[in-house]
Amino acid sequence: MEGWPIPLGQTLVTYFAFTAIIIGRYFLIVWPIHWALWKRPAEKVKARRLSKREPTAATIRNEIKLSTISAFIYAAPAAIVLEMWKAGGTAMYAGLPQGVSGWGWVLASAFIYLFAQDTWFYFTHRIMHHRKLFKWTHEGHHRSVQPTPWASFSFDAVEAVSAAWLLPVLALFLPIHVGTALALLMIMTINAVFNHAGWEVYPDKWIKGWWGRHIITASHHNLHHTKFKGNYGLYFRFWDKVCGTDTGLV
């Protein structure tokens, strides 16, 4: 395979750099959002509260601990694929897209990657809720019955491994611009943080509108945490609706 083997020493340096970046990004994004929603007087928050009780310090500590562990897991495939890309062994590319087809693929590939990730997440997430698998694959995340923004990446190790490898593996054979990949990482992060915020930050009119009713927001995902069943999707309500697991909104 072109780009393989990759230099072990450089890959380790990249791995620890990515770990630091992921952890730093987590705190830089989550802390101000948590402060804006939970540390200010409720009347100043321009959002609809979903959680019935204040988050406890123990809950937040667990969310931060699991999210930090997940960072070490997410960094591994990212480091490997970056080193493979530098050696010409992936389908990632850089440079300014050319023409309508170039820019068209930038947009199309973004949707394909998002839908692929959403599909993978829906079915693996649903499988992890099986009673024989739940305790060692997904229980850690559900300790947050009323989640906070800190729960955005609080996964058990098995779940983190399952989620971390999909996009890097796709990047080995499905062309994606480096800028698109970075944008997807930001979308993934912001989406995860707001969906676990315990507050609905989007207007009800938009959520129930022609586009918003197909998108997963905190109103949708919060029910998954409180009921433990249904609403398994990541970005879109498509698979929940197709498979009959959509339980609506808070």
Model-derived segments and their meaning:
Residues 120-127, 131, 194-198, 218:
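Membrane-embedded alpha-helices of multi-pass transport/permease systems
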Residues 174-235, 242:
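Functionally important transmembrane alpha-helices
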Residues 1-123, 127-128, 136-139, 143-166, ...:
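Non-catalytic, topology-defining segments of multipass membrane proteins
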Residues 131-132, 203:
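Activation segment
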